[in-house]
Amino acid sequence: MSDPNQNGQQGGQQNAGGNYYQQYFQKLTQQAQAGGGYQPYGGYGGYGGYGGYQPYGGYQQFYQDGQQAQQGAYNGYPYQAQGAPGGFNNYNNQFQPQQQSQGMTLDDFHKQKQTSQSAPPKQKKSLKLVSSSGIKLANATKKPKEDEKKEEEPKKEEKKAEPKEQESKKEEPKREGTPRPAAAKDEKKEDLPKLEKLKIKEEQAAANASGADSLIKEQEEEVDEGVVNDMFGGKDHMSIIFMGHVDAGKSTMGGNILYMTGSVDKRTVEKYEREAKDAGKQGWYLSWVMDTNREERDDGKTIEVGRAYFETEKRRYTILDAPGHKMYVSEMIGGASQADVGILVISARKGEYETGFEKGGQTREHALLAKTQGVNKLIVTINKMDDPTVNWSKERYDQCVKNLSNFLKAIGYNVKEEVVFMPVSGYSGAGLGTRVDPKECPWYDGPALLEYMDNMSHVDRKMNAPFMLPIAAKMRDMGTIVEGKIESGHIRKGHSTLLMPNKIPVEIQNIYNETENEVDMAICGEQVKLKIKGVEEEDIAPGFVLTSPKNPVKNVTRFVAQVAIVELKSILSSGFSCVMHVHTAIEEVRITKLLHKLERGTNRKSKKPPAFAKKGMKIIAVLETERPVCVETYQDYPQLGRFTLRDQGTTIAIGKIVKIIE
């Protein structure tokens, strides 16, 4: 048998496109037939187009500058890509066989199989043993199944194992003399991966499909009252929104409730009191608990929907403090869409009540918007009863109640069952946490505000319906976070959901409750923040909906709706455009067709479509949005099926979706 060093030198000097490589393996095949075996090939350097050569232990190595020969063993070759990418490891003057797998690519291996097809099966088996053994047989003989997978790994994995490869080279010739059945066994191992991979892929696909079904089934498992009681200590959650005209005392009332329930400590309130006094706004310090924005404190008016959380012995509450100025009605609508109960704050102070309730004041519009957004329980607090202009006057209180009752009845409230009135003082706290003093107000013996809210009937929740959460806000904090109220269903950490209307699959990584604490599950009615995976923050907008993958929310641009026109200076006809508020979404909408006019009192549909509509009329019409919007019919999901139409800063109509056009 010829000297492997000479063969290695000649083989290393061949280019990638040369024929010597094929000739050399044919020669090895002949030698193996004649001599019963062959020594391992010592590495084919430069293969792959570089044309270099790989040095052997007995070959003097010259650096590129051609100056000094290196006779002894050396460590670390300073130049890369000279036949062996990444440099060389320890080589000694004494010949050490090198594994073929170091310098051969997967394409070369297939070429090798083609050139050796004419050889007898035994030689083919031996050849495969050389190409696939090396480190694997020397170091992992007890785990042949793992070796099958390692053959297909990238070269980087092989490079990491080079030191062990060098240590096992001296033992390699002995392994070449192993019995033929072992080689045949290894040949089968070489042929198995393709079939095994195909089988594995099929099994994985089946597992993924069954896993998806089981995941959806798990996500739709019912949540009973026992689970909820264990999680929340038997306390259900209620979202309340403070509404009313600007300066009615909404933020002051909310801040005082937080202080009385212990959600804000005394030291913080005293700090706000000192700061307000220094700023010449001593009477506003309680409102600063809710109005944390500097602009809000300076102007004394709320701009954004403030959020706060408090807890009583019976319930957990989220406060939504809506802006009272007409410039921020859009924010108020977004807050009302997330509320269960509305607290309409009315100032009894002389002049302020008239300003808020008269045409153009926000008292009327806020009450209307609350009804439109599904706030069917309304608590009307006649505030500032301790003001010197009022002084707990029963006559003033009765006047306010009478006017408001007539108006609330006109916009759809059942005053006897859905509305309650009570006199309070948001600043002093009278009538909030405790009942008013009989000495000051002998004519009222009803409950205080918190007492009444704690004893209200539970809100009907769809805990086991498909999950839906309209997104009210988004942010980036070590990932993408969205905020909103769960309108139906429940959600657990790790659940898979769908972001509509973009149809992006996302995973729930973390769930945070009203107090910013991480929890494992949240149910319908909860105000939550969700950290989601699979979408970037810039690809989300308020009005998007996180929904169940199996029962996603409808994503449409056209629908049929029943519309009631409440305020319109001109007439409404086909082609009329305005702005639609539906849950947390705000979209431009156009009325494309008037279908029917509804008779007053009976709601009977007209046979002929009306040519136009005006204030006070109810119609059935087709509406079309500029972009896809996530909605449902009012019958299926009331919170996603009711909307408000606004034009030029005025609420002109309210409506509910009766049919989806897909």
UniProtKB/Swiss-Prot annotation:
According to the UniProt entry, which residue ranges have a biased composition of type Basic and acidic residues?
Answer: 143-193
In this chain, GTP is annotated as bound at: 244-251, 321-325, 383-386
Arranged from A to Z, the UniProt key words for this protein are: Cytoplasm, GTP-binding, Nucleotide-binding, Phosphoprotein, Protein biosynthesis, Repeat
One GO cellular component assignment for this chain's record is: cytoplasm
Question: For the region G4, what residue ranges are annotated?
Answer: 383-386
Predominant location category: cytoplasm
Annotated region Disordered: where? 73-193
Extract the ranges annotated as region (Charged).
Answer: 103-230
Under the heading CDD domains, the entry gives:
EF1_alpha (cd01883), eRF3_C_III (cd03704), eRF3_II (cd04089)
Q: Where is the tr-type G domain positioned along the sequence?
A: 235-461
Keyword DNA repair belongs to the record: no
Which Gene3D superfamilies does the UniProt record give?
P-loop containing nucleotide triphosphate hydrolases, Translation factors
Cell compartment(s), UniProt? Cytoplasm
A GO molecular function for this record?
GTPase activity
Q: Where is this region: G3?
A: 321-324
Segments for region (G1): 244-251
Q: Name the Gene Ontology biological process terms.
A: nuclear-transcribed mRNA catabolic process, deadenylation-dependent decay; regulation of translation
The UniProt entry's sequence similarity note says: Belongs to the TRAFAC class translation factor GTPase superfamily. Classic translation factor GTPase family. ERF3 subfamily.
What function is annotated for this protein? Answer: Involved in translation termination. Stimulates the activity of ERF1. Binds guanine nucleotides.
Kindly provide the name given to this protein in its UniProt entry: Eukaryotic peptide chain release factor GTP-binding subunit
- Quick one: which gene encodes this? SUP35
